[in-house]
A protein has these predicted regions:
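N-terminal leader/targeting segments
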Residues: 1-78, 300, 484-491
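Aromatic-rich juxtamembrane segments at the membrane interface
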Residues: 6, 172-304, 309, 524, ...
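Active-site metal-binding motif and surrounding structural segment of the metallo-beta-lactamase
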Residues: 539-544, 549-609, 703-720, 733-738
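Di-metal (Zn2+ and/or Mg2+/Mn2+) metal-binding site signature of metallo-dependent hydrolases
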Residues: 245-270, 572-594, 716-727
Length: 787
C-alpha cells in the first residue's frame, strides 16, 4: 500500500504541475499491456507476472490520481469564474470548525451551496468547496447548518517572493473564498447535541486553562491540547518556529496516542473485549479530532491509530508505512490540493523519516542523538522550502523538548479538567506543564543567542532538493548494509567507522542546502502597495536595499521585506539607502531594524539627516549598532568586492553614486531633498530618485546631461504627473522603467501624463500594481516570477 501511495502522490503532483506529465501514465499503461501479452504466452515466470501486475496496478493508480486532480480542479474553475471580490451572495453549509481570531468569529463550512446575488437579483445555486464566514458575534455553533448573506472576499495571491500566499493556503485546505456576513441564520443540524457538546467542552477547557495559569501558558496549552490558537502569543509562536520546535503546537500522533492508547488500555484492564475496546477508543479519538478542528495532521494521526487498533482487534498487525500509505491516498482523494499544504507535507514527512531513516541511521546501541538527527535531517529541505531558514540547534533542543511533551500534555489536560471544578486543584496540576513550557521558552531564548542559531538558506532550488534526497538515499543504502554487519557481530572498529560515516552524511547533506553557487546580478522592485522597496545584488554578491515602506500595507517589514530577503537567501544587507523619511519609504525598514536582521550600513542624505523623522530612524539604527553613512552629491560607494568601499574618485567604477542633494541644497518640500542615486554594475545601470519633482529633475539634467543615461529608471514619485518630465526622460533614455504604487490610491498615481512621456520615449513600462514583484536577472525581466 505504501508503494501505491507513492505512485498516487506522483500522479497528483503530475496533475498539479502540468497535465503534460499525463503521457507518463499512458506510457506505463502501454508497457504494461505489452508485458501482459508476453505473460499470456507464458514467457514470464511467477515473479515476472507479479512485477507486471504491480506495474498494471501502479499505472491505474497513477492515472486515477491525475484524473481526480483534474476533475476537482476543473470543477472548481467552472464556478470560481463567477465569484468576484465584493460580490453579494447567499451561502449555505454545515459548520465543521469555529474560531475566534483578530476580533471576529470565523465559521468554516463544508457541503456548501452558493447563490450569487441576493435581494432582487438572484443567480442559480452552485455547489462549491468549503467557505469561511466572518461574523462580529458568536451566533452559530459547531454542527449547525448556516445560511449567510454577505459579500465575497477572495483570498489574495502572493505578489512577492517569500510572501505568504493566502490563496494557495486556503485552496490547499479546500476553502474557496470567504464571506463577510451581513446576516446569518442557523438551524440545528443532525446530532446537534453531539457537536454542541464538543464545542462547549472545548470552550470550557480553554476557559479553565485561562483561570489556572497565565495567558501565555494557557495559549500554548490550548493550541497543543485543543487546537485553539485564539490566545497563542505571536512571539512565542515565532520563537518556537525559529528554534525548530513549532511542531509541538499542532495536534499530532503523540496526542492521539496518549488519549487513545490510555483509554484503550484502561478498557482492556477492565477486561473489555478487543473489539469493544477498539470501537470505544476509536469513537473517543474521532470526537477529539472533531473537537480540535479536524486538521490534516490530526486526521492522518487518527486514521493511522484506528488502523493499528483495528489490526489488533482482528488479531493482525500492521506497519507504520502501509498505514501511512492508506491515509495519504485517503487525504489526497478527499482533497488533491492538500499536497500544497505545508502541514500535510510536514506530517507525512515526519512519519516517513521515522519509518525509513530512523531504523537505518539510529545508533545500533540506541543513541538518542542520532535518532533525533534521523528524524530532522530528512525534513530540512521541507523546512527550508517553507521558512527559508534552518534552526541549526534544533536537534539538541528537541532532545530536551520531546521527552517532556507527555508530561506537558497530561498535566495540561488534567489541569484543564480540574479547573472546571476549582481553581486551586487546576493550579496544582498545571504546574508541571507551566514549568516545562517556561523551560522551553528559556532554552529557546538561550539557543537563539548563539551565533548561527538560525541560518538563512533561501528557498532551495528543485535540483538541490533532488540532489539532497538522492545523496541521502545512497547513504541510507550504505548505512543499511553497514548496520546489518555490525548487528551480526562486527567489532568496535566497525561501529566507530559507522559513526564517522553518519557524521560525513550529515555534513554533506547540510552542505547541499547551505553552500550555494555564485548568483548573477539581480534587481527586484517589490510590490509594496503605495510605497517603494528596491533590492539589488551586485555581481560581486554585495546586497543593497533602497527605501522600504508603504502607506497602505501594514507590517510591511514582517510580511513582505523579510520574507523576500529570506526567500532569496540574503543573510545581510551591506548598504540600506533611505531616499527620505516619509512613512511610505521607511515603515518596513523600521520593522526590519526591530527584527534584528543584519544591516551593516544605513545611508542617508547629509542635507536631510537633521529632519525629525530621519533622526528617529537613525536613533533606532544606532541602538541596533548599525553604522550610519551620510552621503552628498559626488560621493560614491564602490562595489569592488563583497564588502564594498567608500570612494569619491572613480565615478566609472561599479557601485552607487549620489547625484543629489549637495550639502548646500535646500527645498521647502521634503520630497525635493530625496537622495538621488545612480547605480552601475557592469553593463547595467539605473537611476533611483525617490519622490523628487520635475524641478529637481531639471537641475540634474542641466548639471549632468548625457551622463544620466541608464538602462533602467525607477519612476520618480510613484509616477506622479509632477515628475518624470520630458527633458529628464530624454536625458535618461531608459530601456525600461518600473512604477511602484497601489492599484487604488488617493494620489492618482500613476498619472497618465507621466506615463505618456515615458511611452513617447519608447520606454517599456512595468507596474507593481499589475505585475507584482518585478525582477531583472541575467538580462531578463520577470513579472510575478514569469518572464
Amino acid at each position: 500500500m505504501f508503494l501505491f501511495a507513492l505512485v498516487y502522490t506522483a500522479g497528483t503532483v503530475s496533475g498539479m504541475y502540468g497535465r503534460g506529465f499525463g503521457f507518463l501514465g499512458f506510457a506505463m499503461l502501454v508497457v504494461t499491456l505489452i508485458a501482459e501479452c508476453v505473460v499470456s504466452k507464458g514467457s514470464l515466470s511467477g515473479i515476472g507476472r507479479i512485477v507486471v501486475l504491480l506495474i498494471l496496478i501502479s499505472s491505474a493508480v497513477f492515472a486515477t490520481a491525475q484524473f481526480r486532480y483534474a476533475s476537482v480542479d476543473e470543477n472548481r474553475d467552472s464556478y470560481m469564474q463567477y465569484m468576484t471580490d465584493e460580490k453579494s451572495v447567499i451561502v449555505w453549509g454545515k459548520i465543521y470548525k469555529t474560531e475566534y481570531k483578530y476580533f471576529s468569529y470565523r465559521y468554516y463550512m463544508t457541503d456548501c451551496v452558493v447563490q450569487p446575488g441576493y435581494g432582487k437579483a438572484f443567480g442559480r445555486k452552485i455547489s462549491c468547496g468549503d467557505v469561511v464566514v466572518y461574523c462580529d458575534s458568536k451566533s452559530a455553533h459547531l454542527g449547525d447548518y448556516m445560511k449567510a448573506c454577505g459579500k465575497i472576499g477572495l483570498f489574495k495571491s502572493a505578489t512577492n517572493e517569500g510572501e505568504f500566499d493566502r490563496a494557495r493556503f486556503y485552496r490547499s485546505q479546500g476553502i474557496d473564498f470567504s464571506v463577510n456576513a451581513d446576516s446569518i441564520k442557523t438551524s440545528a443540524g443532525k446530532h446537534a447535541w453531539y457537536y454542541h457538546g464538543l464545542e462547549k467542552l472545548r470552550d470550557t477547557l480553554s476557559a479553565s486553562l485561562l483561570e489556572v495559569t497565565d495567558e501565555t501558558t494557557a495559549g500554548v496549552l490550548s493550541s497543543m491540547l485543543l487546537g485553539d490558537k485564539s490566545y497563542l502569543d505571536d512571539e512565542i509562536k515565532d520563537l518556537y518556529q525559529v528554534s525548530g520546535i513549532s511542531h509541538i503546537l499542532a495536534i499530532s500522533g503523540l496526542h492521539i496516542s496518549i488519549v487513545g492508547m490510555a483509554f484503550y488500555k484502561l478498557l482492556r484492564k477492565r477486561r473489555v473485549s478487543y473489539t469493544a475496546a477498539f470501537v470505544c477508543s476509536a469513537a473517543l479519538i474521532l470526537s477529539y479530532a472533531v473537537m480540535t478542528g479536524n486538521a490534516v495532521s490530526t486526521r492522518r494521526a487518527v486514521g493511522m491509530f484506528i488502523l493499528t487498533m483495528l489490526a489488533a482487534a482482528l488479531g493482525r498487525c500492521t506497519d507504520m508505512l502501509n498505514s501511512l500509505g492508506i491515509m495519504v491516498i485517503y487525504l489526497l482523494w478527499d482533497n488533491p490540493m492538500v499536497l500544497g499544504y505545508a502541514g500535510f507535507v510536514f506530517s507525512v514527512g515526519a512519519i516517513l523519516a521515522i519509518g525509513i531513516v530512523t531504523p537505518v541511521m539510529s545508533a545500533p546501541k540506541g543513541g538518542k542523538f542520532w535518532t533525533s538527527v534521523s528524524i530532522q535531517l530528512p525534513m530540512l529541505p521541507v523546512v527550508a522550502m517553507n521558512y527559508y531558514e534552518l534552526p541549526l540547534f534544533a536537534v539538541f533542543v528537541n532532545l530536551i523538548v520531546i521527552p517532556a511533551l507527555p508530561v506537558v500534555f497530561i498535566s495540561g489536560l488534567l489541569a484543564s479538567a480540574a479547573g472546571c471544578f476549582g481553581v486551586m486543584p487546576g493550579k496544582l496540576l498545571v504546574f508541571p506543564a507551566f514549568a516545562a513550557l517556561k523551560l522551553y521558552e528559556m532554552l529557546c531564548g538561550l539557543v537563539m543567542k548563539l551565533p548561527g542559531a538560525s541560518v538563512i538558506t533561501g528557498a532551495p532550488d528543485g535540483y538541490r532538493i533532488f540532489l539532497f534526497y538522492a545523496v541521502m538515499s545512497g547513504f541510507l543504502v550504505a548505512f543499511s548494509l553497514k548496520k546489518r554487519a555490525i548487528e551480526c557481530g562486527l567489532k568496535e572498529k566497525g561501529q566507530i567507522l559507522y559513526s564517522v560515516q553518519r557524521v560525513v552524511c550529515t555534513a554533506v547533506l547540510l552542505a547541499i542546502l547551505f553552500v550555494k553557487p555564485k548568483t548573477a546580478a539581480q534587481l527586484d522592485i517589490l510590490d509594496v502597495g503605495q510605497g517603494d522597496g528596491i533590492f539589488y545584488r551586485f555581481e560581486s554578491g554585495t546586497c543593497i536595499f533602497i527605501d522600504g515602506g508603504s502607506s497602505d500595507r501594514k507590517q510591511l517589514g514582517e510580511n513582505v521585506i523579510m520574507p523576500f530577503l529570506k526567500y532569496n537567501g540574503i543573510q545581510s544587507i551591506s548598504y540600506w539607502f533611505v531616499s527620505h523619511a516619509d512613512s511610505d519609504h521607511i515603515s518596513g525598514l523600521s520593522e526590519v531594524i526591530d527584527s534584528g536582521y543584519t544591516i551593516e550600513h544605513i545611508v542617508v542624505a547629509e542635507a536631510a539627516a537633521k529632519e525629525e523623522a530621519m533622526e528617529e530612524l537613525l536613533f533606532k539604527a544606532k541602538e541596533a549598532e548599525i553604522d550610519i553613512c551620510l552621503m552628498s552629491k559626488g560621493d560614491s560607494i564602490e562595489i569592488n568586492d563583497a564588502s564594498g568601499s567608500h570612494s569619491t574618485a572613480n565615478e566609472e567604477a561599479d557601485g552607487i553614486m549620489c547625484l543629489y542633494p549637495g550639502p548646500s541644497d535646500t527645498a521647502l518640500d521634503r520630497n525635493d531633498m530625496c537622495l538621488v542615486l545612480k547605480l552601475t554594475d557592469g553593463r547595467f545601470s539605473g537611476i533611483f530618485g525617490g519622490d523628487i519633482s520635475s524641478e529637481v529633475e531639471k537641475k540634474l539634467v542641466n548639471e549632468y546631461g548625457d551622463e544620466l543615461s541608464v538602462d533602467f529608471y525607477k519612476a520618480n514619485h510613484h509616477g506622479s504627473r509632477y515628475s518624470s518630465s520630458a527633458d529628464w526622460i530624454e536625458a535618461l533614455s531608459p530601456r525600461w522603467a518600473a512604477v511602484s504604487c497601489a492599484a487604488e490610491n488617493r494620489y492618482g498615481h500613476p498619472a497618465d501624463e507621466a506615463m505618456d512621456r515615458l511611452m513617447d520615449a519608447k520606454c517599456r513600462i512595468l507596474y507593481t500594481m499589475q505585475s507584482g514583484q518585478i525582477k531583472y536577472k541575467e538580462s531578463a525581466i520577470y513579472e510575478n516570477n514569469r518572464q
